[in-house]
C-alpha cells in the first residue's frame, strides 16, 4: 500500500485565510469600539438633571433630592452590591473621593438594602451620602441601563459628564478633573458638553 504524499496548504491559501481572519478581527474591533462609544452617549448632557427624591440607604426615614444638592457640583455614582465592576473600581473611587474635589453621592440601584450596607462595610464607603432606588424606577429618568454609571452635575443642576462603566485613574485625571476645573473657573458660564470616550 503506497502512501500518497501529504499535501500542505499552498501559500496562496494561507494568505487568503490570514486575510479573512484579519478582516474579521478588524470588523469586530470596529464594531465593539463604536458600540462602546454609543453606550456612553447620554441624552442628558447639557440638560438639567432629572428630578429625584430618594431615601438614604443608611436611614430610609430621610430623603435627599436633587434640590438638596443644588448650588455646588456633585458626582452621582450608580452602583450595586451585585456589580463586579463596581467592586473593581471602588479603590479608584475611594481615592478620588478623599481628594474632596467634588461631592460624591452614591446611587444604590436595584439592590437589597442589607446587601448594599454589607458591601459598603466590607469595601469602604467613599460617598458623602447614598440614596437607594431598589426598584430602579427613578434611574429610568437618568437613562441608567447598567452599573456602574457616573454623572457629573454642576452647581446649576446641569449634567456635564457621563460615563457608563468602571472608572479608572486615567479617566479621572484626563476627563473628569479638567471638566471639574472648567466648572470651578466658570461656574456661571454656559456648560461645555463632555462625553467619556
UniProtKB/Swiss-Prot annotation:
InterPro entries: Periplasmic_diS_OxRdtase_DsbE, Redoxin, Thioredoxin-like_sf, Thioredoxin_CS, Thioredoxin_domain, Thioredoxin_ResA/DsbE_sf
Keywords: Cell inner membrane, Cell membrane, Cytochrome c-type biogenesis, Disulfide bond, Membrane, Redox-active center, Transmembrane, Transmembrane helix
GO cellular component terms attached to this protein's record: outer membrane-bounded periplasmic space; plasma membrane
Domain annotation Thioredoxin: ranges: 43-181
Pfam assignment, any one: Redoxin
Membrane side Periplasmic: residue ranges: 33-197
Chain ranges passing through the membrane: 12-32
GO MF, any single term: disulfide oxidoreductase activity
BP terms from Gene Ontology: cytochrome complex assembly
Keyword set includes Cell membrane: yes
Cellular location(s): Cell inner membrane
Paired cysteines (S-S): 83-86
PROSITE patterns: THIOREDOXIN_1, THIOREDOXIN_2
Function, in words: Involved in disulfide bond formation. Catalyzes a late, reductive step in the assembly of periplasmic c-type cytochromes, probably the reduction of disulfide bonds of the apocytochrome c to allow covalent linkage with the heme. Possible subunit of a heme lyase.
Record family assignment: Belongs to the thioredoxin family. DsbE subfamily.
Name of this protein: Thiol:disulfide interchange protein DsbE
Taxon lineage: Bacteria, Pseudomonadati, Pseudomonadota, Gammaproteobacteria, Lysobacterales
Gene: dsbE
